Amino acid sequence: MPIAILSEHNDLADSVRDLVKRVAPSEVLHEALETPIANPPTYWKAAAEQGLQGVHLSESVGGQGFGLLELAIVLAEFGYGAVPGPFVPSTIASALISANDPDDKRLEALASGDAIAAYAIDSGLTATRQGDGLVVRGEVRAVPAAAQASILVLPVAIDSGEEWVVLDADQVELEPVKSVDPLRPLAHVRANAIEVGDDRVLSNLSRTLARAVMSTLLSAECIGVARWATDTAAEYAKIREQFGRPIGQFQAIKHKCAGMIAETERATAAVWDAARAIDEASETSAYEFAAAVAATLAPVAAQHTTQDCIQVHGGIGFTWEHDTNVYYRRAIVLAACFGRAADYPQQVVDVATTTGMRSIDIDLDPDTEKLRDEIRAEVAALKAIPREERNTAIAEGGWVTPHLPKPWGRGATPIEQIIIAQEFASGRVQRPNMGIAAWINPSIVAYGTNDQQQRFLPPTFRGELIWCQLFSEPGAGSDLASLTTKATKVDGGWRITGQKIWTTGAQYSQWGALLARTNPSAPKHNGITYFLLDMASEGVEVKPLRELTGNAMFNTVFIDDVFVPDEYVLGEVDRGWEVSRNTLTNERVSIGSGEPPFLASLDQFVGFLREGQFDQIEQHEAGRLIAEGHAAKVLNLRSTLLTLAGGDPMPAAAISKLLSMKTGQGYAEFGVSSFGTDAAIGDPEQPSGKWADYLLAGRATTIYGGTTEVQLNIIAERLLGLPRDP
């Protein structure tokens, strides 16, 4: 999934992608490995004709008048194409000048493509004040595109602080140096007592904003590289055969490719969030945090995915002639352009524990305010109802699951659902908690008879009926096609015998959704029927399973010749697989949308860090975990916005579920490891015992609702198109 969500952003990405394909095919990239790149490159004019050099610049200087998000979309496509030459450095340099003054006349030549600029994120330049200007001395090492540029935007140290200056290339001494990536030439820049007037000092550009702009836009190119590596590895895995089948059918390759797309999507979400934060001109801490998150994740994603792409290709990936050579080199140089890698996770920790993390909010169109006012009034009316009657009113109004069709829901659009959730939260009106029923109710609505709907849905929505899900079996786990619980037709119903396991909350449930095999001669996914089981029926025995935490959330359920009337068959006989697929889809959306209550949350983790003392290595690890946790939340936001835009939210939702559970485990592992010998204390009243509980409970999160390994298979097959197991 690219950065773009809105249709106009997708159109922009498509147009840039078309240009990149034309001007930077593989043969052009490999030619640039051997021979110097023309200056300006041959594509420069075509890019200027599309307005790409000035997409982010003000119309007052000939730009397109858009923002950093649009430029990030452009740079991601240039990264995907590993486009040679100075385009990315030049647009980042112009973004710095624009951040200081969007009407700066120097931007006119940059917007039109008549000039090329370069920048550095760090430098060894120092300045002393002389009248109204500065005198600059020193050296900046390994500046990308410096030898191709006519304008240089560089930081200088002065008075224990930092200023940014704009120098002409003919004022400095340039020493070209060999670049790891020949497509991105480097040069050392030396300044020998250069006098710089105050009109060349970017006095409105703070160090915080400058670094946020640079790191966000560099990160955008990184995710383009990562996406190319992921796509290329997956495509090769589909066609390369070993041992008589495509290598993409082997689970080891599937999991590697799924890990690549997961890491890429996480970094993409972070870049999108950072670019939006800067464009919103929100509080400094918000964009500082978001940009540091992007810089923590994106260059690592580019390096990991290009390395894995080489690995998937095997020997051919380790040749000079293969494109993997080009992209791995680009990833290495991009990572270097960020400066010290450890600075960014440290910055994440510093901002998170002082001014706070960037909030995750959904901004809706102002046209929705009338709808919001109406919903707010209805929520206020519900709040005025006596508490003992309120749940009935909420249920009858369709507020519990508003996306369901009337009368069970409100037939709410995605936008309405968001507003309803926001207004119930802000109005402090609590809706009945559906628990497992949140996954079962949609199946009853979709497949149930009128009698079944009337019998079960109203009391469930009122919170009076508790449900469990009787799917998994010993030996089969979540492999529903292999279930062996048997249902035999008898007069007026069915006799069911079997055993279910890992049934959450069965000891508290009045009803269960049960799958049983009704036709053993049918293919594995056929011959299964979906039953609604009264848990008080004779022959049903529930035995709690004590988990490694000492608690008993799961259960084994023994079903011994239990009679289930025909009226409790949901959907058609032998077609229960279809009904269960509806339930499982609801399960995945639900689990992927939040943090489990028994797992340490991101906010709890940051609070823990705020109260403790940690060394640099620990802070670096903590910053990485915070960045990953924040990006997982942004993935959820993107999933919601994709739904609003009519797109497919599945990739972001599936990957968010996969990543958020692993990150939650990471919080607990970090917390426990920080206690030293006290980590052995299991008293939940003590901080170490509390985090030990999180650590123990967290092992379940990568198992229930689909194990990590199964999720990786699903991601590889559904998102990357790798072949299914035979």
Language-model region placement:
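N-terminal glycine-rich flavin-associated loop
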Residues: 85-102, 432-451, 477
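A short, Trp-centered hydrophobic/proline-enriched beta-strand micro-motif
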Residues: 113-123, 463-471, 515
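Glycine-rich beta->alpha junctions and the first turn(s) of the following alpha-helix
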Residues: 2-14, 52, 79-80, 172-265, ...
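Extended, hydrophobic interaction surfaces within ordered domains
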Residues: 223, 230, 243-356, 690, ...
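Glycine-rich phosphate/cofactor-binding loops in nucleotide/flavin-utilizing enzymes
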Residues: 2, 73, 92, 315-380, ...
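A short core secondary-structure module
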Residues: 133, 137-173, 177, 497-543
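Amphipathic, small/basic residue-rich leader segments at the start of a protein or domain
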Residues: 1-87, 343-435, 445, 455, ...
